[in-house]
């Protein structure tokens, strides 16, 4: 018999599948892109300033490096558990069909995207505590995009958050990380003073991200 955890995974997956083809599904496809420079902009609306390599170089580099750290933190567990992803069980579409070959070869548990999103949310909340509520919410719904995309189970996403938090805790032992935090804080202050807002439609993004599987944690 399925455990309560399995039942939750299946229930959330059913709710997520109902969002296929919606604006939230399209947002999940955009959230899947971790390549830079696109990845640097995933949290720009939540932060409230534009992020780019030219005008916020320390912040840009901090996000890029921490992406690598958080991704690395999940790889051993993915290899160990080799959990089948939802689309392999339910035979339904994913929001990024071009990634299918890679997804089939990579274990579902834990979610690397969720780990990265949570890492970014925690780091950015330290740099800009006045935006912490929006940033933490973005970290959560960034992971939930993997549910909507039909490539992760709820338990994968939760485990990803744990791995993200562990990644940030380890980074705090690195003096270079602390220096980068301070430099990034100054860049954000300068960007706010200059009125450099995110390029995207943040009102529309925020509205779309309010849509989530009802039972998601």
Show the residue positions of the predicted features.
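Alpha-helix boundary/capping detector
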Residues: 103-104, 161, 168, 193
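Hydrophobic alpha-helical bundle signature of multipass membrane enzymes
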Residues: 1-148, 180, 210-214
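Acidic, carboxylate-rich catalytic segments that either coordinate divalent cations
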Residues: 172-217
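Interfacial helix-loop-helix junctions of multi-pass membrane proteins
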Residues: 141-172
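Short alpha-helical linear motifs
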Residues: 82-90, 157-165, 185-188
């Amino acid at each position: 018999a399925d455990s309560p955890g399995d039942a939750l995974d299946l229930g959330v997956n059913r709710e997520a599948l109902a969002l296929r083809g919606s604006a939230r599904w399209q947002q999940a496809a955009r959230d899947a892109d971790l390549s830079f420079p696109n990845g640097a902009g995933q949290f720009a609306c939540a932060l409230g300033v534009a992020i780019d390599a030219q005008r916020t170089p320390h912040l840009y580099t901090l996000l890029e490096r921490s992406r690598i750290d958080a991704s690395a933190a999940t790889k051993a567990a993915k290899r160990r558990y080799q959990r089948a992803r939802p689309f392999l069980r339910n035979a339904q579409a994913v929001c990024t069909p071009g990634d299918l070959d890679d997804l089939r070869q990579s274990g579902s548990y834990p979610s690397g995207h969720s780990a990265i999103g949570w890492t970014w949310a925690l780091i950015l909340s330290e740099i800009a505590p006045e935006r912490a509520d929006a940033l933490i919410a973005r970290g959560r719904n960034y992971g939930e995009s993997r549910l909507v995309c039909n490539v992760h189970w709820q338990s994968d996403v939760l485990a990803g958050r744990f791995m993200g938090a562990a990644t940030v805790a380890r980074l705090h032992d690195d003096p270079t990380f602390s220096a980068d935090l301070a430099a990034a804080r100054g860049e954000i202050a300068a960007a706010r003073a200059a009125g450099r807002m995110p390029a995207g439609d943040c009102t529309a993004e925020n509205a779309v991200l309010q849509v989530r599987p009802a039972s998601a944690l």
